[in-house]
Amino acid sequence: MNPWTVVIHAQAEAELLSLPPDMRARFLRIAEMLEEFGPGRIGLPLVRPLTNKLWEMRMQGRDGIARAVYVAVQDRRLLVLHVFIKKTQRTPSNAISTALKRWSGVQ
C-alpha cells in the first residue's frame, strides 16, 4: 500500500513558517505520524474532524495553541490548507472558510 504524503498549500506554508519554532516542530511531528500511520490511525489529541472533509492538526506550545486545517485528497495525499494561532475555545469560522476557499481553488 502506498504511504500517505502531507502536502502544504503555498499560503499555508508561509503561515506555518510564521509560527514559533516549538509549534513548527509539533506540526512536523504530527505530519510525520500522519504519513507513517495514515489519518485513520491518528486521533485526539493530535487531530480531530472539523466539518465536511476538513480535519485539524492540534499543536500546543509555550506561546499558545495553533491549528493546521487539512483535507484528504486523491492519491493518499493530505493537503494542509490553513495554519493559524488559535485565540478562542472554538475554531474560528473564518479559518474554516479560508481553508474551504483554498481547497476549492486547488480542485
Please give the residue ranges for each predicted region.
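ATP-dependent carboxylate-activation loops
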Residues: L81
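Hydrophobic/aromatic beta-strand elements that line small-molecule binding cavities or substrate pockets
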Residues: A68-Y70
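Basic, Lys/Arg-enriched alpha-helical interface segments
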Residues: M1-I65, Q74-R77, I85-Q107
